[in-house]
Swiss-Prot record:
N6-succinyllysine, modified sites: K11, K51, K253, K257, K393
Protein's name in the database: SEC14-like protein 2
Gene Ontology BP annotations: positive regulation of cholesterol biosynthetic process
Gene encoding the protein: Sec14l2
Major place of residence: cytoplasm
Organs and tissues of expression: Widely expressed. High expression in liver and small intestine.
InterPro entries xrefs: CRAL-TRIO_dom, CRAL-TRIO_dom_sf, CRAL/TRIO_N_dom, CRAL/TRIO_N_dom_sf, GOLD_dom, GOLD_dom_sf, SEC14/CRAL-TRIO_domain
Amino acid sequence: MSGRVGDLSPKQEEALAKFRENVQDVLPALPNPDDYFLLRWLRARSFDLQKSEAMLRKHVEFRKQKDIDKIISWQPPEVIQQYLSGGRCGYDLDGCPVWYDIIGPLDAKGLLFSASKQDLLRTKMRDCELLLQECTQQTAKLGKKIETITMIYDCEGLGLKHLWKPAVEAYGEFLTMFEENYPETLKRLFVVKAPKLFPVAYNLIKPFLSEDTRKKIMVLGANWKEVLLKHISPDQLPVEYGGTMTDPDGNPKCKSKINYGGDIPKQYYVRDQVKQQYEHSVQISRGSSHQVEYEILFPGCVLRWQFMSEGSDVGFGIFLKTKMGERQRAGEMTEVLPNQRYNSHMVPEDGTLTCSEPGIYVLRFDNTYSFIHAKKVSFTVEVLLPDKAAEEKLNQQGAVTPK
């Protein structure tokens, strides 16, 4: 039995009745605590009454703390309204709202430099509530229960800039919030135009997703437009995505409904860095350098780094060793990222590199040009691995290579 209204086993019926009884004290604080609503929490915790109750009570506290009942009337800051990509557009064949996330033009760093993380998260909470409100309106309009949404992730242009650690962490917070407070609202999620970097990006966010959510993700290949049309009527799908829907002015991207983001002008910036915690600190003597080695076992892995220096600039470059088991000078190794000096004492530096071949990669902090000052450098380096299942699927389908 699916655990949905009209498809409950006797044991599930009993669990639903008991659950309603156990949480009756908090039901008045919830917008529409019908059987459909309660069953979402039960399904999310496999009908474990104790876990379902704990989850729902935590959600009630969340609604109170974040003032969720009034969040729809809240207006996000201008920079978020203008540049946070995505939007609701059309309905699938069952009448469920369709939400688009447009990844490529999203300027994640610009958003975190221009708005608070709390305002960004609050905007996503507001989006969730607006989608649930739309589900309620669709239920009344169609005369059948609509309680889930279809999502389309447009990954064209997904690049290394999207792997910036603070952005991934902020997105992880949103996913955690979504999983904990809007369970069983995702019907399915289509990933379209996924580049070769997608398996690495997916592996970063996968820990924040429940097993049930992961099963609802479909990574589509070159025939993605045909697949979408099996789930969404052409008149409900923008021309950009294979349908016939346009804006009133004929725009095929339906920009009146879907925000396509873009680079944020620096006049919106309220900060030029995001506070970081670093895993390592090292004192580099004058006229010296410090090398950190990372073994890359297969192509497609991504090196991600952040560093800052104190008092003055520092050189940084990445090299590939040509001899194993011994320290090599920079001139003896293959240069991968040219060495240059960074003002990381003023603004912390960060970056990513897709490793095209296996081997020992050396990240080299350079102070050889300084004959007077030692430098303290704090840094974090990670090796990001691709999700193998997603990678295999993309290889089978012939993934789009990012430009």
